[in-house]
């Protein structure tokens, strides 16, 4: 799976029930060979992917392409990646804690 393919799957694994009443934008800045920016916007529980990102996300995750794919494939725990500096988080940390429930098959 490529980085782009992993993001294209996000709307399919998004859990609208976990986002009920939520209006937030999450953004991922991916570095490395498959570098790119993707945002996922949630408005009143409905989500959509925004390739290229947005100007002012509520939270930004920065991670290498290889580590991102390892996280999405379940080979690297996101919390462990954060604690070891492989995954950087800026913005709403409470929102970061909700990501596993928003995207249950994304790790």
Model features per residue range: what roles?
Residues 1-107:
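Feature captures hydrophobic
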